[in-house]
């Protein structure tokens, strides 16, 4: 069996004295889309922040391409090829759309994602490239956040609640772009409360409940009843 791109093993994580994750394990294969679902406070964002190096953990709790990175700082994780699209987008208000995108490419990692390719993926950003990024609609700001992460030419893209606060039609538009991203050879981990979108986009699903994996399996094999039981802990 080929080695996974990402291998999370018995990960414990938290904030100070508060423990948010308890022995979480998951794998992501090259080119795979994995969804992590769960209610508010289930530990989904903590999992992504741990993988991204925003929260340091045990060295061998997270392996990327076979290399232990659990204790790596965020900048070292990005350099290895992992990029995070954070919850809330976190764009630089004083910078234009194009300036925000260019920040993602500062490491100079080689790959297919250039400004031209981002504008091809999200044409509306080309039209608004000289505007302040925070003057855009919420959906367009999310496109900037995704584009900025892609500009680092990652092998693994982590997306934290990309549908949060967006109209359903905008969410569908953004999710419709994900296959084009995967086609460039990326793997994706999507944290999502919208279960329908998560199941449609992913091949594997992990459901967290109070910091633990309550359910894991192929997206097309999980029943609504099983997901509801794991999601709500009933």
Locations of regions flagged by a protein language model:
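ABC ATPase NBD coupling module
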Residues: 56, 68-89, 111, 115, ...
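ABC ATPase C-loop
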Residues: 149-150
């Amino acid at each position: 069996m080929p080695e996974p791109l990402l291998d999370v093993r018995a990960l414990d994580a938290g904030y100070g004295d508060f423990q948010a994750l308890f022995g979480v394990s998951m794998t992501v294969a090259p080119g795979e889309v994995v969804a992590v679902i769960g209610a508010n406070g289930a530990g989904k964002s903590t999992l992504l922040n741990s993988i991204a190096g925003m929260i340091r953990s045990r060295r061998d709790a997270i392996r990327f391409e076979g290399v232990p990175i659990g204790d790596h700082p965020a900048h070292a994780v990005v350099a290895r090829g992992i990029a995070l699209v954070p919850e809330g987008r976190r764009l630089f208000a004083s910078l234009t759309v194009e300036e925000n995108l260019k920040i993602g490419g500062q490491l100079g990692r080689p790959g297919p994602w250039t400004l031209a390719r981002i504008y091809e993926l999200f044409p509306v950003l080309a039209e608004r490239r000289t505007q302040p990024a925070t003057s855009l609609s919420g959906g367009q700001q999310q496109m900037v956040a995704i584009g900025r992460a892609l500009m680092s030419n990652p092998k693994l893209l982590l997306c934290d609640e990309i549908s949060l606060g967006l109209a359903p039609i905008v969410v569908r538009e953004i999710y419709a772009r994900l296959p084009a991203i995967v086609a460039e050879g990326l793997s994706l981990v999507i944290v999502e409360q919208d279960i329908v979108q998560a199941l449609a986009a992913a091949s594997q699903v992990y459901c967290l409940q109070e910091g633990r994996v309550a359910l894991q399996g192929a997206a097309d094999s999980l029943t609504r009843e099983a997901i509801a039981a794991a999601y709500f802990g009933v």
